[in-house]
Amino acid sequence: MATIKVTQTKSSIGRLPKHKATLRGLGLRRINHTVELEDTPCIRGMINKVYYMVKVEE
């Protein structure tokens, strides 16, 4: 399965609780933290929810 790299680029302070939970679900904890995840529809949906706080590399 293909993988993608997701990096948190903005702080989660002051964001909606659901968006904070989504970042946690992606495994992101702080700014510039990068995780490598499988490219699945579920993960893509989570990324789309917090697109303004993350950067994605294919």
From Swiss-Prot:
Gene3D superfamilies: Ribosomal protein L30, ferredoxin-like fold domain. GO terms for cellular component: cytosolic large ribosomal subunit. The keyword Ribonucleoprotein applies. This is Large ribosomal subunit protein uL30. CDD domains: Ribosomal_L30. Keywords: Ribonucleoprotein, Ribosomal protein. Part of the 50S ribosomal subunit. Pfam families: Ribosomal_L30. GO terms for biological process: translation.
